[in-house]
């Protein structure tokens, strides 16, 4: 009889979130050799999108957990969401503990992952935990919390985070920098960390249409419009750059979208537009750009490769990134000549970034785009990275 794998996934298709599609790909791949069950909450991300609750796939079982959801960026609601989903996932785990051989623990960060990890330890079920963002550290970025308060918060939350990493068979991280940092700060053996880049469905990026001929330089941002995306900073810098015959297109939804739309009105900008695209439309939309943009707050991009950067590079376009200068994003963009980075949270630096690309010839921008595509195909595809996770899980199940 096939061994049974339980994937606990805080987000899952049809939600248009990177982790949702990573876990879907993982479920499909594992279902070739194992019985796979996915536990997921009602789909709610991104805000503003509408979904059907009965989404399923014939290759594996999907169980919809009727738990509290709170997609808004508000701490108490998010805590309640994480706690409720994880507790109900643990109820399922307890009821089926004698049937389950392995858990992929991708619930909500901190207390959510901790609750599930404790249940796995209690029932002696091996698990892997993936880490996309570093908590509690990222809760304290771009906030005006006094230093003494940060120390108190860290002293409470760091042990919560350390528990589910220490007790996991492997911890999947998305960059060498992240693995090094977590191993050092959590005092956990570096060999426990598995570094696997986030991937995209690279099939969607095949046979992309050629960019439309235009004298206009088109800057684009495609992704969530939330407080960590710094879309307001992009708008202000683009306005100040005042590049002739240029356009800024912003695609996505999120809790800061209305504020950003109001900012555009207040600044009197007529060359900034907003839209929303499905995941399938993203490659085509991005192929229309002259330059793709991302802007991460200080401390948010120094230890990981943003998932949207993978999508940007696969699109074969140059990238302007406002990020930490000791980050993997800078290492790739400038080391592989795929784009330009500027310091984070600095409007004047981003203004200069816009102007830099405007001063390049179209041929120079196209060459950067070719470099982007070449790097992505070598390092960021599903074929390259999914198998690393699958092989790790298979090796754990073989030992059991």
Residue ranges and their predicted role:
Residues 118-122, 151-171:
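Membrane-proximal helix-turn-helix segments that form the acceptor-binding/catalytic region
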Residues 1-58, 400:
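N-terminal subdomain of nucleotide-sugar transferases
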């Amino acid at each position: 009889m096939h061994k049974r794998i339980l994937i606990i996934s805080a987000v899952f298709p049809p939600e248009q979130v990177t982790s949702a599609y990573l876990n879907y790909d993982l479920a499909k791949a594992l279902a070739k050799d194992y019985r796979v069950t996915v536990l997921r909450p009602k789909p709610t991300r991104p805000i503003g999108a509408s979904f059907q609750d009965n989404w399923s796939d014939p290759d594996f079982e999907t169980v919809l957990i009727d738990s509290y959801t709170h997609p808004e960026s508000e701490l108490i609601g998010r805590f309640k969401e994480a706690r409720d989903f994880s507790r109900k996932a643990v109820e399922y785990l307890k009821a089926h503990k004698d049937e389950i051989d392995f858990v992929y623990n991708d619930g909500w960060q901190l207390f959510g992952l901790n609750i599930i990890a404790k249940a796995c330890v209690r029932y002696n079920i091996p698990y892997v935990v993936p880490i996309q963002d570093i908590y509690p550290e990222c809760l304290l970025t771009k906030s005006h919390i006094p230093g003494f308060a940060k120390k108190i918060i860290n002293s409470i939350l760091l042990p919560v985070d350390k528990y589910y990493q220490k007790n996991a068979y492997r911890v999947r991280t998305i960059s060498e920098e992240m693995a090094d940092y977590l191993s050092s700060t959590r005092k956990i053996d570096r060999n426990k960390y598995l570094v696997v880049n986030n991937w995209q469905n690279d099939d969607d990026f095949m046979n992309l249409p050629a960019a439309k001929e235009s004298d206009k330089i088109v800057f684009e941002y495609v992704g969530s419009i939330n407080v960590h995306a710094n879309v307001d900073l992009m708008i202000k810098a683009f306005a100040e750059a005042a590049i002739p015959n240029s356009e800024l297109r912003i695609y996505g939804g999120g809790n800061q979208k209305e504020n950003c739309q109001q900012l555009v009105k207040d600044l009197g900008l007529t060359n900034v537009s907003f839209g929303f695209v499905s995941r399938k439309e993203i490659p085509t939309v991005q192929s229309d750009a002259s330059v793709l943009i991302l802007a991460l707050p200080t401390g948010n991009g120094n230890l990981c490769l943003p998932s949207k950067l993978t999508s940007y590079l696969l699109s074969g376009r140059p990238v302007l990134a406002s990020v930490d200068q000791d980050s993997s994003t800078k290492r790739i963009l400038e080391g592989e000549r795929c784009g330009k980075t500027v310091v984070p949270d600095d409007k004047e630096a981003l203004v200069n970034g816009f102007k830099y690309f405007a001063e390049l010839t179209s041929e120079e921008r196209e060459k950067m785009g070719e470099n982007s595509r070449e790097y992505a195909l070598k390092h960021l595809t599903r074929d390259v990275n999914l198998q690393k996770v699958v092989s790790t899980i298979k090796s754990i199940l073989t030992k059991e």
